[in-house]
Amino acid sequence: MNVVVDTSVWSLALRRNTQNGAIPIINILRDLTSDGRVVLLGVIRQEVLYGIRYTEQFIRLRDYLRAFPDIELTSEDYELAAEFFNTCRSNGVQGSNTDFLICAVAHRRGYSIFTTDKDFENFQLHIPDVLL
């Protein structure tokens, strides 16, 4: 099964100073990468590349991320994301547009989601997202 890796995981994995708590997450990402199971949404790629101060670092990271295919999105992905947002909001659960798009894309394709963002655990109470 392919896995949508969320920005929170990429941020941990790409930090210069890795904390001990991040090592298991980094190891899982490494395994998923070597198995060819990692896919990206363009918006996650964009978030990962935001705020890179030095051009050389930006280019190096951009080129590294190009190894991972972007998922082509359809109108149905956006519509389902809106439906998920509305369902969660009506149950008092908040989330970002990007988070609900990740859930919709993963659900429609049978992918799992790899994230450290605890909001996704709240989403699971109301929508069918599959966390790794």
Give residue ranges: language-model regions.
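Short, well-structured N-terminal submotif of metal-dependent ribonuclease cores
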Residues: 1-40, 50-63
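Active-site neighborhoods of divalent-metal-dependent phosphate/nucleic-acid chemistry enzymes
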Residues: 69-116
